[in-house]
Amino acid sequence: IATSHYYERIRTDATASTRQQAQEGNYWDSFLNLNFDYDKRNQKYQTSEGFRSRYFIDLPLISDTNTLGNTYNFNYFAELYDNNRSNFSIYLKSVDSISNNDVKLSERVFLPSSKLRGFESGRVGPKDGNDFIGGNYASAINFSSTIPQLFENSENIDFLFFVDAANIWGVDYDSSIDDKSTIRSSLGLGIDWLTPI
C-alpha cells in the first residue's frame, strides 16, 4: 500500500483537436496505490520455473478526473529442454473515470515497448488527427524462449526467439474517433544481456 501525488500542467499547440485543447490546464492528483504480488519463481534472475502474478490498483483520492487505473501482469516460466528458459506473459491495463469525466491525455494507456517489440513506442493505437493519444484499455500476450548458446563462455548473454501480440483501444473523450482496435503482432530474435548494473 502506498500513495502517489502529482502536479502537472497540460499544454497543447495549434495542431491539437478542440477536445484535446479543452484539457489544457493545471491538475493536482492524489492516489492510493494497492499492489498485490504473488511470486512463485525459483529465482528472480534468469528464471526457469514458476510464475508471478501482479495486480495494481490506483484509486483516486483527490482528482479532477477521478481516474481509476487497473493493471494486471502474469508471467509463467518453464524449461522446455536442458538449459532453456521460456516465458509466457499476459498484460492487461485499463483507465476509466469513476465520475464519468474524460481521462486526461497524460493518464491514457500506452503499451510498454517490451510488450510489443518491433513497433515504435507510443505510436500504436487510437489517433486524434495526427496525434497518437493512447487508449482506455490495453492488452498483450508475449512468449519468449532462449535458443542454444552460439558462443562458449557467454553465460551472461541469452539469444531468444519472441512472439508478441497486443492491442490498445477505447477513446472516451470523443466517440467519433476510430479507436483503431486492431491486434498488432511481431516475432523475431533478440538478445538478453545480464550485467551487474
State the predicted function of each range.
Residues R11-N156, F161, W169-V171:
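C-terminal outer-membrane beta-barrel translocator/porin domains of Gram-negative envelope proteins
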Residues D164:
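Short basic (Lys/Arg) and small-residue
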Residues D172-I197:
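C-terminal beta-signal and terminal closure region of outer-membrane beta-barrel proteins
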